[in-house]
Amino acid sequence: MGKKFYAMMAVLAFAAGGMDVNAVYTLDGIEVSADRQKDRFGNMITEQSYYRTGGDVQVIDSDTIEKRHYTQVGDALKYIPGVQVQTPGGYRGGEYGYTQTHSIVSINGDARVIILVDGRRMDNSVGNPVADYAAGSKSIIDVNQIVGMDNIEKIEVIKGPGASIYGADATGGVINIITKKGALKPVGTIDFSAGSWKRFSYGLTYSGSNDTGKLRYFFAARRELSGDSHYHDGITGKNYTWHQTGYRDNTLNARVDYKFNDRHELAFSYNHMQGNDDYPLTAPDYRYLSDAEWNRIKKDYFQNDKYGNFDNPGYRNLWITWLGAYNIYNKNNYDLTYYFGKDHGMDSFIRFYDQHETYFGSFGAGDREDAPTPFTPAWDAWAKKNHKGRDKKSYFTQLKNRGLQIQYGKAVGKHDLLTTWTYDKSRYYDTHVRKKTTSSVERESVLGYVQDKIHITDRWEITPALRYSYYSDFAKVSKAGVHANAGKSVSVVTPSVVTQFAFDDTASIYAGWTKVYRPIRVGDYHLTNTDYSSGNKVDAKLEDEKGDVVTLG
């Protein structure tokens, strides 16, 4: 893919307003509340802000989420300057690997954004629910299929590679979701809302602690459902019902923390998300729904092989026959973390995680040449006869991650030393529903970094870092049972250096340079659709993406 040089230049950024004279800037042993606090450089302080090394960072706190009643992560992110959220519009869910049906986030036009929960990456190195191949999108996760909103304490938006900890491939930036933990005093909430089109939302949260406060717990559950949505057609000027846009989504989150003493703590978290969503793909074009136009569309498609609205005007109306089409995803993610130290705001811990994600759905009745003109009396009878239920499956895909993460932080004089190492084993399973055969792809990775945040003065710090990335080759098993390997194992070290300087309590400047590295992913090779018993010389020419990023603000 060759080297690319990315430069983002900004006018000197001044902190908005004066700094709070009562703000606490020391991070040692700090218990960060929902109150807004800033460090000496004007950066928002969060539970994990110390790992950042400067840059354009904005934080969405729980008060903002609750007051504005955001129902999805994308709803909150789209109000951040420079952040764009692409959604299918009108319906939820999404077909696995089909970019246009997913919610994708980009920062300053770059979709290579890493999404984390409590500092841990949530993507899978061999499977991509958002895009089966790189030409579809460089995004690697659906932003609205990560964690329930009731479980979110804060959302950090880091534009550009603002911290070495988050990986050498985060060229666009990082979104770090920080989850809630139990309160010292028992507190619970019940939430209910209703709206047009049979929309309902039921939510419940409860948190508290034991008598000593050492054991804390948090629990959240929510169900959201809706019937078919309605919309105004700008072309015809009429209002219509958008059929097959209903959904039923469930979230369940639980977290338990036990504090042995000031240095040792054990935390367990569980995150469940499930979407059971109708699938319309796109809205009809009512200009082409007469008997004559419908028959022309079918003839051009089935007999003359004309695809797309340019060659076959009204082509998208063919999807109306996908009666009963749906997409379902089911996610169950676990984390167990043991904290064994905290020094100058830096946690030392060891974490085990396990992710299980399942995606399946159907295209309903599919493309049907025998279908009568939609929304006519003849159509109603035909639709009732040919509607498919949830028992039909057109695709079935599973993603699994299992890994171990170790972090250690130590302050030595003016040096704050921090290192993190993560071993991850990612697996992808694709099942041929009709033949009941399964292909799989597997890849191991080790990602690590060493960072030294040097406090030169009270107003100036510089942070050099080295990042290590190891990716194994792809181990594959085809649907025919053929075992093979593709690609090659790679080990890369990428440096970075970031500095920030505070002129006074109202103005600061930051600058940084980093080498970026994005490994070839399974979608680049398109391995999941390749006959592994034969070679692919075209794929062999692909190279990992490398380059430089310079930031100034």
Task: Describe the role of every protein-language-model region.
Residues 427-429, 472-479, 487, 500-551:
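Surface-exposed extracellular loop regions of Gram-negative outer-membrane beta-barrel proteins
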Residues 184-185, 193, 205-326:
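Periplasmic-side early beta-strands and strand-to-turn transitions of outer-membrane beta-barrels
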Residues 42, 46-48, 74-124:
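Extracytoplasmic beta-strand/coil segments of soluble accessory domains associated
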Residues 259-274, 318-480, 485-486, 502:
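Face-selective signature of the C-terminal outer-membrane beta-barrel domain
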Residues 73-76, 103-106, 116, 142-145, ...:
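N-terminal periplasmic accessory domains that precede
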Residues 104, 120-159:
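Short acidic/polar hinge/loop motifs at secondary-structure boundaries
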Residues 31-68, 130-135:
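N-terminal periplasmic "start-of-domain" segments of outer-membrane beta-barrel proteins
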